[in-house]
UniProtKB/Swiss-Prot annotation:
Pathway where this protein functions: Metabolic intermediate biosynthesis; 1-deoxy-D-xylulose 5-phosphate biosynthesis; 1-deoxy-D-xylulose 5-phosphate from D-glyceraldehyde 3-phosphate and pyruvate: step 1/1
Recorded name of the encoding gene: dxs
Species, as recorded: Renibacterium salmoninarum (strain ATCC 33209 / DSM 20767 / JCM 11484 / NBRC 15589 / NCIMB 2235)
Known function: Catalyzes the acyloin condensation reaction between C atoms 2 and 3 of pyruvate and glyceraldehyde 3-phosphate to yield 1-deoxy-D-xylulose-5-phosphate (DXP).
One GO BP annotation of this record: terpenoid biosynthetic process
Keywords: Isoprene biosynthesis, Magnesium, Metal-binding, Thiamine biosynthesis, Thiamine pyrophosphate, Transferase
Record text on subunit structure and interactions: Homodimer.
Reaction catalyzed: D-glyceraldehyde 3-phosphate + pyruvate + H(+) = 1-deoxy-D-xylulose 5-phosphate + CO2
The family this protein is said to belong to: Belongs to the transketolase family. DXPS subfamily.
Source lineage: Bacteria, Bacillati, Actinomycetota, Actinomycetes, Micrococcales
Binding sites annotated in the UniProt record for Mg(2+): 145, 175
Name the UniProt record assigns to this protein: 1-deoxy-D-xylulose-5-phosphate synthase
Pfam families cross-referenced by the UniProt entry: DXP_synthase_N (PF13292), Transket_pyr (PF02779), Transketolase_C (PF02780)
Length: 657
């Protein structure tokens, strides 16, 4: 039996010798490589925090002390030492989450995997501890150097530093990367830091003597105050020369480091020093992403930040896909557009390769800007670029648009800025769970005045709609598409004057217009399946793809008036989505056709494959067709209306689909 199998609780780590800790760290790395290779997941980030996580759990007392992992994707080692070693289920439906999850363990605190929030959590928890008379409990926040590029971290630091009695330990896991190398002035600053004599500077006696001297000199008249200012300036100068950590200490935070993030004894010493100080402290640990796994270290792109199923020996995908992904289609097309237009600039929030801007960056490096993990800043700087005569294309995951909503509304839309926002991983994304599903965007974007929203159904439509988007210079445009591979081309049988594509219509010779199926984006294949199932029951249907769902095309309203019921199929939340907007436009035009919104419930959806998640919520062709048949027959609301001069007979019976 290996050491790892004997660890079921953090307290089990206390009995291990130095030699056993080294052995355990190696066992953990071997375990992660072997298991994540079979399921996929965040491998590189977890290989770099093995010793760091062990040190935290040996010095602090979880769950009495709260341990928070910013973004949470580096919590695998934490899971292992808190009794969760069934990694064969990682990111599988019903299995272990790829992030922290309160439903799994009392040791998990923050479930959201959106970056830069951990310090605000730490601020709030530590305040609650003090107010509840539990100020002796620690809060440890583990945050990467990449997440420190998010402005929210500095808002939290401003508050944490103001209260010297709260026991907050901020562990900066500095591997020089988020997905890719961390960029910006902060990254340069962190690289400049040098070791210092932290055990002295963070000792309570040192602080006490410093305060006593300060008070005596400041109360000693003009000469005393002059002497204090001189000594303070000298101290600061020596400190910044010896260890230029002034940024943190000028905020009022004690700084320890940099510490070798793979030296177990040094890490534990640093953690113990921070604990003994019993106030806000930053521990700066230098780590290697992908530590101990040669294929990860050799991966220049992101050092195996996230992998699919791979050969653990070589790191190569076991089933390399030859299909084209949505992201790669965008990457090719935006690079070609940039070749043609000098005013096109790309903006990414620390995700150059994942969102597909790398090809444009290879050809036009001066016209692709990585702003760090800063979606709010990305959108407002885009508005400024548009004012300056450029056309910015801001590419991000759909789930991260939530963070920049105010900037999109007030800085971009209010000023009618010609900015294109490209949302990757829209809809249900699968294994990464509730905080990564891009299911909120369709509802959020409905309320932004003047915004144009496109949802391409295939690669050809993505290319053409991207070009249409960047041709608009007086309003924001948004494109959204799914995660993974693009499906087969879905050709239209007709394109209407306002750009709406007719994908299928009633058989020739039929005079019935029962159902109008409005397919949003990648739901076209399902919509056509629904039409086929309805046709087998003698129910006629027309299938349309609006292409641009905002503003609602006039032809959609006209077609709605010609049918008995409208079914809008979308992979966003039903509340306030595309279906809801079409209903409002229909009513405003005096069209009283029944309409049913088919989409996702307003719930946080647990992880699983895309197909499994859609099946759980009933968003399948079989279920949708079954409901539509009932609505046409008049046994389920909303009832399909009779058309003028049409007599409809309701049977009240359900056919078998």
């Amino acid at each position: 039996m290996g050491l790892l199998e004997t660890i079921q609780h953090p307290a089990d780590l206390a009995r291990l010798s130095d030699e056993q800790l080294v052995q355990l760290a190696q066992e953990i790395r071997d375990f992660l490589i072997s298991n994540v290779a079979q399921t996929g997941g965040h491998l590189g980030p977890n290989l770099c925090v093995v010793e760091l996580t062990l040190a935290i759990h040996r010095v602090f007392d979880s769950p009495r002390d709260s341990i928070i992992f910013d973004t949470g994707h580096q919590s695998y080692v934490h899971k292992l030492v808190t009794g969760r070693q069934h990694f064969s289920t990682l990111r599988q439906q019903g299995g272990l989450s790829g992030y922290a999850d309160r439903g799994e363990s009392v040791h998990d605190v923050v479930e959201s995997s959106h970056a830069s929030s951990s310090l605000s959590w730490a601020d709030g928890i530590s305040r609650a501890r003090v107010l509840n008379g539990e100020g002796d409990r620690y809060v440890v926040a583990v945050i990467g150097d990449g997440a420190l590029t998010g402005g929210m971290t500095w808002e939290a630091l401003n508050n944490i530093a103001a209260d010297k009695d709260r026991r907050v330990v901020i562990v900066v896991n500095d591997n020089g990367r988020s997905y890719a190398p961390t960029v910006g002035g902060l990254a340069d600053y962190l690289r400049s830091l040098r070791p210092a004599i932290d055990s002295l500077r963070t000792h309570k006696a040192y602080e006490g003597n410093l305060d006593w001297t300060k008070n005596k000199l400041q109360n000693g008249g003009f000469l005393g105050q002059l002497m204090y200012k001189s000594l303070h300036a000298a101290k600061k100068g020596v400190k910044d020369w010896w260890a230029p950590q002034g940024l943190f200490e000028d905020l009022g935070m004690k700084y320890i480091g940099p510490v070798d993030g793979h030296d177990q004894k040094a890490l534990e010493s640093a953690m113990q020093t921070a604990k003994n100080y019993a106030g806000p402290v930053i521990v700066h640990a230098m780590t290697d992403k992908g530590r101990g796994y040669a294929p990860a270290r050799a991966d220049e792109a992101d050092q195996f930040h996230a992998v699919g199923v791979i050969d653990p020996e070589t790191g190569l995908p076991l089933d390399p896909s030859t299909a084209q992904s949505w992201t790669s289609v965008f990457a090719e097309e935006i690079a070609e557009i940039a070749d043609e237009r000098d005013d096109i600039v790309g903006i990414t929030a620390a995700m150059l390769i994942p969102v597909g801007l790398h090809r444009m960056a290879e050809r036009h490096p001066q016209r692709v800007i990585d702003v760090g993990i800063a979606e709010q800043h990305a959108l407002t700087t885009a508005a400024g670029m548009a004012f300056g005569g450029l056309h910015p294309v801001v590419a991000m995951y759909a789930t991260f648009l939530n963070r920049g909503f105010d900037q999109l509304l007030m800085d971009v839309a209010l000023h009618k800025a010609g900015v294109t926002v490209v949302l990757d991983r829209a809809g249900v994304t699968g294994p990464d769970g509730p905080s990564h599903h891009g299911m909120w965007d369709l509802s959020m974007l409905q309320i932004i005045p003047g915004l144009h929203l496109a949802a391409p159904r295939d690669a050809t439509r993505l290319r053409e709609e991207l070009r249409e988007a960047v041709a608009i210079s007086d309003a924001p445009t948004v494109l959204r598409y799914s995660k993974g591979n693009v499906g087969a081309e879905v050709e239209a049988i007709e394109r209407l004057d306002d750009g709406v594509d007719i994908l299928a219509r009633r058989p020739a010779g039929s005079t019935e217009n029962d159902v109008l199926l409005v397919s949003v984006g990648a739901m076209s294949e399902m919509s056509l399946q629904v039409a086929n199932l309805l046709g087998a029951q003698g129910i006629s249907s027309t299938v349309v793809d609006p292409r641009w769902v905002l503003p609602v095309p006039q032809s959609i309203i006209e077609l709605a008036a010609q049918h008995r019921i409208v079914i809008v199929i979308e992979d966003g939340v039903r509340a306030g989505g595309v279906g809801s907007r079409i209903r409002q436009e229909m009513r405003a035009a005096g069209v009283d056709t029944a309409l049913n919104e088919v989409g996702l419930p307003v719930e946080f959806l647990a992880h699983g494959s895309r197909g499994q998640v859609l099946d759980r919520v009933g968003l399948t062709a079989q279920k949708v067709a079954h409901d539509v048949v009932a609505q046409v027959l008049g046994t389920k609301v909303p009832f399909a209306r009779p058309l003028p001069n049409e007599q409809i007979t309701h049977t009240g019976q359900f056919p078998t689909l």
